[in-house]
Amino acid sequence: MIVRNVKDVIGTQDEVRTDTWVSRRVLLKKDGMGFSFHETTIFPGGRTHIHYKNHLEAVWCIEGDGSIETIADGKKYELGPGVVYALNEHDEHWLCGGKEPLRVICVFNPPLTGQEVHDADGVYALPAEAQAA
């Protein structure tokens, strides 16, 4: 059994910070669960281009506000407590912080290894062993 407190991730290599978000990666590939589980905060006013070509992601909004806008069709969805969205089609999108920090719980498949950040195309790269398969 794995039991962790998200507070124990703060200040470790499993807390990844950019200009627009901070992600506390509580379960990772090394944990062998087949998915990764993160608590992420989107900063107010931030705007992040994301296109997970290699991963599927489900997101549960816990507190705060923001929006997500799909690039293909320009549809915009407001985000707040209780909203769940799933990027089941590798949807390219803009994730935008609102007036308050947006705290979300994220699940990724395949699982992240821990240090991923979005590249210039908004993508998380696959680990080397997955690319070779």
Curated annotation (Swiss-Prot):
Keyword Lyase: yes
Recorded family membership: Belongs to the ectoine synthase family.
Pfam families, per the entry: Ectoine_synth
Superkingdom of origin organism: Bacteria
InterPro entries associated with the record: Ectoine_synth, RmlC-like_jellyroll, RmlC_Cupin_sf
EC number per UniProt: 4.2.1.108
GO molecular function annotations of the record: ectoine synthase activity
CDD domains: cupin_EctC
HAMAP family for this protein: Ectoine_synth
Keyword tags: Lyase
GO BP of this protein: ectoine biosynthetic process
Function (record text): Catalyzes the circularization of gamma-N-acetyl-alpha,gamma-diaminobutyric acid (ADABA) to ectoine (1,4,5,6-tetrahydro-2-methyl-4-pyrimidine carboxylic acid), which is an excellent osmoprotectant.
Official protein name in the record: L-ectoine synthase
Organism the protein comes from: Bordetella petrii (strain ATCC BAA-461 / DSM 12804 / CCUG 43448)
Pathway: Amine and polyamine biosynthesis; ectoine biosynthesis; L-ectoine from L-aspartate 4-semialdehyde: step 3/3
Catalytic reaction(s) noted: (2S)-4-acetamido-2-aminobutanoate = L-ectoine + H2O
